[in-house]
Amino acid sequence: MVIWRRYLSGTAQPLVFKKMNKALAQAAPREHVVRRLEQPVGMPQPPTAATRYVEGNSMLDMFSEEKTSRRAAELAAEFSKSGLYDAATFRKTNGRVFLPPASYWRAEHARYFPHLGGRTLTGARGSVEDVLAGKVSVVKVFSCETGEGLASSYFRHEGHDYLREDDVAPAQIVEISLTESWIKDWLVRLMAGRLRSLVPAARHERYFICRRAQLPFTVRESLELGNLYTGYVLVVDPQLKIRWMACGGAEKRDAELLWKCVRGVQRECAAV
């Protein structure tokens, strides 16, 4: 018994826990600063059905000082941006947690939309990238009713409501409801009948219900999709690259900028 106790009671704390404790102790919510998006957002590699975004360290990584330090910093950032932080930021900014870029990003610099799998309003399972590929799309992303309402304001343009009149929209519209938990996922699916009555039938196969957990915290941050309460609008080109992005409610000039960017990307694609 003495030997057993001796082997299990080392005095040194495992490296990963030391790094984590230090980082968490220094983590404190910082005042959110609204800034304009300038650098392209997205993933470095195109999405595929086999893509999985992993967060955390393997057992071997726990013995690497560099990897444990990086993971500790990630955990500290996630800890500092809790649901309460998201709610406070949303109230302060009215959902405009960042300002959109003044124009669309050039194709050679743009980054990719992530892989997301889910169920559409038709009841079929599928990957979002399969619907996006080959077309210029305007993608609406939200996790709650408030966020959906804000993002929907970008689709009211020139006397039309493109979400109600899908046949007049200048580009393909794709909607993604990111459910925060299995309970919310179940509730959204329970309401699928009501959603089908609100969304034009032609767009049912382009309305996805996806689990938010597919995108770990660090991935959501790199995509600027971190705030749970606001809504997002993205312009995605036929090669699945994010060319423009906005969040929160749209003023008239914001909606005009969105559809101006859509036309610009469409002209660019037609010229290739």
Curated annotation (Swiss-Prot):
Record keywords: Membrane, Mitochondrion, Mitochondrion inner membrane
GO molecular function, one term: unfolded protein binding
GO biological process: mitochondrial proton-transporting ATP synthase complex assembly
Top-rank taxon: Eukaryota
Keyword hit for Metal-binding: no
Pfam families: ATP-synt_10 (PF05176)
Compartment(s): Mitochondrion inner membrane
Cell division among keywords: no
A GO-annotated cellular component: mitochondrial inner membrane
Protein function: Involved in assembly of the mitochondrial F1-F0 complex.
The family this protein is said to belong to: Belongs to the ATP10 family.
Protein name (Swiss-Prot/TrEMBL): Mitochondrial ATPase complex subunit ATP10
Organism: Eremothecium gossypii (strain ATCC 10895 / CBS 109.51 / FGSC 9923 / NRRL Y-1056)
